[in-house]
């Protein structure tokens, strides 16, 4: 966002929407309508609020540009899938969105099957959400399924619960599943992951990571795995792992610590918005990140 927008709105959904609307008004004035709106965030609450506000503002101004949905830098594995399902599912269930992307730090072909599942379940999810909302008791949302695939259950539960948790209609989640294909611990872990993705309750570290592109000059998936393993014993951290300096500094600003590719074989480390170490050899970077985390934790204690 520009300094002008930041000074008036701050880093908020309102600022993101107004920044976008300024360009759309120019497009309308010039009768240029070949536009798709992609307005994303790695925070699902911000992402959902921003897209909703964008849709309302376009309607007020008589615009009807298509909306592209996605949770940017969602990560990888089941956490990346759940976070994407929470954000995208909340909006699809409200009839918003014309195209979607599930942004995963994995091979590109892994994204499409997940996106197809979200689209296929969207209408059913909207109906289930309406029914589930009526059953919320003392802030606890209970969802019941009969799934044999853990991934399918995770995606459906994340879509069904997302908007209700983001909007504060529930503050806890219980997931039930018929049969013995999915164990009770997996159901609890899924509920915890959904609560964290919706920013309701944090039970483990959060990792923000990009899907990688031609600018990424190190093995992103391998590095994410190494950082996750090295920080597994820590709690409550938000770590951004970004492939390059184009999007990296902006994304790490919202994280406690950032690991950003700087050049071939080189990495820079961030503590929030501040770059602490530049151009570290890649083979030393994970250990130096751990040292930075430990030093920061010691200063705060």
Where are these regions (language model features)?
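Beta-strand/loop-dominated core regions that host nucleotide or nucleotide-derived cofactor-binding catalytic loops
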Residues: 264-267, 274-298
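Nucleotide-binding motor/catalytic cores of P-loop/tubulin-like NTPases across gene-expression machines
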Residues: 245-251, 255-275
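Short amphipathic alpha-helical patches
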Residues: 50-51, 114-115, 254, 275-282
């Amino acid at each position: 966002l520009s300094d002008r927008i930041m000074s008036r709105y701050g880093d908020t959904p309102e600022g993101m929407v107004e920044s976008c609307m300024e360009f759309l008004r120019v497009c309308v004035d010039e009768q240029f309508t070949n536009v798709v709106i992609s307005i994303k965030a790695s925070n699902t609450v911000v992402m959902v609020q921003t897209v909703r506000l964008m849709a309302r503002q376009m309607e007020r101004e008589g615009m009807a540009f298509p909306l592209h949905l996605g949770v940017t830098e969602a990560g990888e594995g089941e956490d990346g899938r759940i976070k994407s399902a929470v954000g995208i599912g909340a909006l699809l269930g409200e009839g918003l969105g014309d195209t979607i992307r599930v942004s995963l730090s994995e091979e590109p072909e892994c994204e499409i099957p997940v996106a197809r599942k979200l689209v296929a379940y969207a209408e059913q999810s909207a109906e289930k959400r309406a029914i589930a909302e009526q059953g919320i008791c003392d802030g606890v949302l209970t969802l019941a399924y009969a799934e044999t695939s853990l991934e399918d259950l995770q995606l459906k539960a994340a879509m069904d619960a997302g908007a209700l948790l983001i909007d504060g209609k529930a503050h806890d989640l219980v997931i039930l599943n018929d049969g013995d294909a999915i164990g009770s611990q997996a159901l609890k872990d899924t509920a915890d992951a959904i609560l964290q993705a919706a920013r309701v309750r944090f039970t483990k570290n959060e990792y923000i990571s990009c899907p990688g592109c031609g600018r990424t000059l190190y093995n992103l998936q391998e590095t994410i795995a190494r950082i996750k393993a090295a920080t597994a014993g820590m709690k409550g951290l938000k770590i951004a792992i970004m492939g390059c300096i184009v999007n990296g500094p902006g994304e790490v600003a919202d994280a406690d610590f950032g690991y950003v590719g700087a050049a071939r074989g080189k990495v820079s480390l961030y503590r929030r918005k501040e770059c602490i170490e530049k151009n570290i050899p890649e083979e030393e970077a994970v250990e130096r990140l751990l040292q930075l985390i430990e030093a920061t934790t010691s200063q705060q204690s």
